[in-house]
UniProtKB/Swiss-Prot annotation:
It holds the Pfam family Ribosomal_L27. The lineage of its organism: Bacteria, Pseudomonadati, Chlorobiota, Chlorobiia, Chlorobiales. The gene is rpmA. GO terms for molecular function: structural constituent of ribosome. It comes from the Bacteria. Keywords: Ribonucleoprotein, Ribosomal protein. Belongs to the bacterial ribosomal protein bL27 family. GO terms for biological process: translation. PANTHER family: LARGE RIBOSOMAL SUBUNIT PROTEIN BL27M, RIBOSOMAL PROTEIN L27. One of its GO terms (cellular component) is ribosome. Residues 1-21 are annotated as: Disordered. This is Large ribosomal subunit protein bL27. NCBIfam families: L27.
Amino acid sequence: MAHKKGGGSTKNGRDSNPKYLGVKAAGGSTVAAGTIILRQRGTVIKPGMNAGLGRDHTIFALIDGVVTFRNGRNNKKQVNILPC
């Protein structure tokens, strides 16, 4: 017989909060200046024309315009904002 009860329940029961990463404004959508376009961990997608990069690698619009995604140099994905 075991001399202690099962202690598994104290070792379980943790779960991290969701981080809500991903694209927030799809390609072709109209955005205002300051709108978050996508949240990411690391620079998987790079900011292009009229797009800024936050300190947590969030890409946001610098001007009012239309969001476009394309492959930039060295086949890296890039987000551009075209003025409308």
